[in-house]
Amino acid sequence: MEKLIILLLVAAVLMSTQALFQEKRTMKKIDFLSKGKADAEKQRKRNCSDDWQYCESPSDCCSWDCDVVCSG
């Protein structure tokens, strides 16, 4: 009976450490993807021209406010 309890405890510890490592890998992927998104946003802002230009979508404008022309 004691061996069974020890075996169950060892299995629980192994499962929890596996879940912990899997969570860390997921967080690294999220950090990596977020960094790329932040870099793309910085690039967009660098290429951002003045307001009152014609636009087709909010992403065309620095202010993200498009109504035929950018407004902000």
Curated annotation (Swiss-Prot):
Keyword Nuclease: no
Main location: secreted
GO MF annotations, alphabetized: ion channel inhibitor activity; toxin activity
Species, as recorded: Conus textile
4-carboxyglutamate modifications at: E56
Protein name, as recorded: Conotoxin Gla(2)-TxVI/B
PTM note: Brominated at one of the Trp residues.
Modified residues (Serine amide): S71
Pfam family membership, one: Conotoxin
Keywords of the record: Amidation, Bromination, Cleavage on pair of basic residues, Disulfide bond, Gamma-carboxyglutamic acid, Hydroxylation, Knottin, Neurotoxin, Secreted, Signal, Toxin
